[in-house]
A protein has these predicted regions:
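DUTPase catalytic domain/fold
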Residues: 1-164
């Protein structure tokens, strides 16, 4: 069986540029996911609210070339999961859709829908409540900031944009 891994490309918007370079430098291969940072202060009361992360991302699945002895690899776009971090319980928040399944063609800003279990919760800029996880819990070996991401037919269409 050949080793498969993932590469995460991050297009950071102005409001999140300070967090992600530091997170990339300090990440550990022992982590199951890549932590995301809130890019705005958000107050959550009675209705669900979207927490923005200030980034657009692309996850690539990387596989060694089949039947080859070379170091060449095949890279393909991959779906990924947006999951709450275990520490989210301290915030009084609950992810409204339990797990976010992000299509490989999505090119909009990442956001997480949350409910307040207390009826009055807040999120501050820089809070880490969510993470990107590879679909098979695979290793996100490389994370890098990029200046652009390739366009897709879907583009930035967000929640519910591909059907009811």
């Amino acid at each position: 069986m050949t080793a498969v891994w993932y590469e995460l490309e991050i297009l950071s918007h102005n409001d999140a540029q300070t967090f992600y370079p530091i997170a990339i430098m300090n990440r550990s291969d022992a982590n199951a996911g890549f932590d995301l940072f809130s890019s705005e202060n958000v107050q959550i009361e009675q209705t669900p609210v979207l927490i923005p992360f200030g980034i657009t991302v692309r996850l690539l699945k990387v596989e060694p070339m089949p039947h080859g002895m070379s170091n060449e690899v095949v890279k393909t776009d991959s779906h990924f999961l947006l999951m709450p971090r275990s520490s989210i319980y301290k915030s009084g928040l609950l992810m409204a859709n339990s797990t976010g399944v992000i299509d490989k063609s999505y090119r909009g800003e990442l956001k997480a829908p949350v409910w307040s279990m207390t009826g009055n919760s807040s999120v501050q800029v820089g809070d880490r409540l969510f993470q990107i996880v590879a679909p098979d819990m695979g290793w996100i070996r490389h994370v890098r900031l990029v200046d652009s991401l390739p366009d897709t037919e879907r583009g930035a269409g967000g929640f519910g944009s591909t059907g009811k």
